[in-house]
Amino acid sequence: MKLPYSWLKELIPDLPPVADLEPTFAHLGLPLEGVEDVPAPVGGVLLVAVKAAEPMEGTQLTKLTLDTGENGEKTIASGAPNAVGLPAGTMVALVTPGTTLGGITYGVRPMQGVESWGMAASAKELGIGESNAGILTFPAGTAAPGTPLRELWPADSVLDVEVTPNRADVLSALGLARDLAAYLNLELKEPQIPAAPTQPGEIRVSLPDRGRVLDRDPQGKLRFGCDHFAARAVSGLQNGPAPLWMQRRVSLAGMRSIDLIVDTSNYVMLELGQPTALYDRRDVAGDGLVVAFGLREGETVKDLLGNTHQVGPEDLLILDAGMSDEPVMTVAEAFASAGQPKEGSHVLGIAGIMGGDHGHVRADTRDVVIESAHFDPVLLRRTSTRLGLKTDAVYRYERGVDPLLAPKAAVRVAELLRAAGGTPEAGQTVVGTPEVPQTITTTGEQIRALLGMHIGTAEMRESLTRLGCTVTGDGDSLTVTPPSWRVDMVIWQDLAEEVARLHGFTELPETLPTLRVHESNIGASAQSEARAELRRTLAGLGFQEVVTYTFTSDEEAQKARAEAPGVRLRNPMTTDRTGMRTALYPSLLRAAGAHPKGERALLFEIGRIFPAAGEQERLGLLMRGDLAARTYQDGVRGDFSVFKGLVQGFAGAVGASFALEQLRGDDVPAALHPGVAGAVVWNGERVGWLGALHPEIAQEFGLKGDTFLMEAALPLPGRDWAFRDPSRAPAAWRDLAVIAPQGVSYGDIVGVLKGAGGELLESVEPFDVFTGEQVGAGNRSVAVRLTYRGAKTLTDEEVDPVFNAQIDAVKARGWAIREK
């Protein structure tokens, strides 16, 4: 946020110089992003009065006859669009002959038959603003003709303050001055604003019911549509340039000066932090304003810039009351009561965001209706984000505007317009019941314990009072009611932060915190530690962790043959991030594709997916390329057996059992090669799948060579551990060769042998695979070593029954035992 130092100095007369303020802002938690020194206009720029503005026939120029004071009457030719029809008396900034500006020295020169004496300049040309849409103009009587502009527009310093999202109260000159005055313990001189009239005005206002349930708000985060609204009419205005002092402040704050009415609205927002809107009263039918939840789905509203927006039942709009004398809930109801008027003709604006094409002020506006309101910040944020409308007003609303400020801001606008020649009506309509700050109860000891600072309770009371809080309580107790503008002060920890801020964060002692473990956090800590263990183990095996977006698109899901996104984003950041992913492996494929070609990739990710069944946490692994660098000899090529071995090593490292069950037919995930796919069995439970990436998908993602994937649900099932003394007895072995069809997986064979092996069977290890005429066409022989161990040395009489039971189990499956 940008503000001129002179504005803050007016509010805090004893404010230190700019050079001394940088540490102060840092201590307040509002660091300065920069300080820009803005020089005064050069000495040869004078304020002069327009006597006549005449179009020059056959040209795009306007002849201006000027009263320059001591230099008498002069003429210039101007091509500025706003020079046409300038009223007599209007003052402009004239660059006089002999003055150098922007490297150009101006003089007297003939232009289309007119002797042009210098140039009427824009704010940008003078270096005092960003607008170059036309010449800089001021109201008649701003100064005596011939007055140097620098006398009324002195040099200044513009402070660029970094404001955190929770500190909406400092998004104004008054709010920032309050904080500075409280910290520096200096006197604050607030703007003199009369009390709001107690009698209602001529403008009627209708608000929507509170507590309305919206389809897209099942958790009730939206508290209200509009809970406070002030409206007042001002008549007899002569719209034109704003006063010089107002233009100066608006320009230095980074906004473009438009005209008296618009600048006044912007000025009050910059001064008090309350956005306002002003409508041409000619367009406010029925002298009433209706705040209503949006049009029927799919209807459109045109904003004051001419852009069309599609709005729906959950967007808050401002309408005139010409359609009905009764309060309405929705615009659709209002349309129905009016017999379907022309689309958009009665919509005055999108509440709190931007005015509409109908009702905005124009050059010939004489009478206005002031709107000053408090809207639901969540509702406005959603609407502005969806419509892509980010304005200075919604920037403040979505962070939290003072809910009680609306009537005061309306009075301020009315009084500034009165000073410019307007006549505010005697009354002011105020409707709604805004939320008031809730009382917070704490103790000095509680705050001291949190901060670790020895601050007396009396000092805490004094600090909070300086911030505008109402503080009561005896002894060590503190009962605090925050000011209405501090919507961020809700719990006692917020009070502790404010005490520390005013006392000085630099005074915080360097002490180790006292950590308290609550029983409700034990489960969460265990889950976090389990994830950390997974990460450490996988990193030890050579995998690198990647963290990718949970967003994806239909196109990417289709490329990866994954389920299309079911959860859609209303306002996607980009076209390739339109929904929530339903699988983890497409993200890993994208990350692998970003690796330099030819390099190996051992990647893992622990992340969330959002399929139709609901949100899940997953572990994904990917391997491609060589496992060892290729130099003068071949490297270690990453194949399926290597990848499976890495997963087995991972399981062993975390004390889990791992098995792979072959998948066939429709059970094979679409991402995998039909012949190299298996189900991951972890501690006896199926948790996911593992296999080779389908070649067509690899081609889609630009991955050459073999790529292997695993995806499993988290948390991985644990084992029920029971301690057993290691046996001191030796093991007994038997070798067995099983002849089975080649379609039978090794995992199936092991499962049969383990199922019949009982407690004596310790392990099953393969040592030979054979195919040939001896075992029959379409078959293969898998030879395994069976290891048995008991509490004592096993005899043949104890081992043979178990071994024979395993042989019987094999034969029962229709398989054979190879004798030779």
UniProtKB/Swiss-Prot annotation:
Record-annotated FDX-ACB domain positions: 727-818
Record-annotated B5 domain positions: 435-510
Reactions performed catalytically: tRNA(Phe) + L-phenylalanine + ATP = L-phenylalanyl-tRNA(Phe) + AMP + diphosphate + H(+)
Superkingdom, taxonomy of origin: Bacteria
Cellular localization per UniProt: Cytoplasm
Cofactor note as given: Binds 2 magnesium ions per tetramer.
GO CC aspect terms: phenylalanine-tRNA ligase complex
Domain tRNA-binding positions: 39-150
Self-association state and partner proteins as the record states: Tetramer of two alpha and two beta subunits.
Protein name (record): Phenylalanine--tRNA ligase beta subunit
Species this chain originates from: Deinococcus radiodurans (strain ATCC 13939 / DSM 20539 / JCM 16871 / CCUG 27074 / LMG 4051 / NBRC 15346 / NCIMB 9279 / VKM B-1422 / R1)
Higher taxonomy: Bacteria, Thermotogati, Deinococcota, Deinococci, Deinococcales
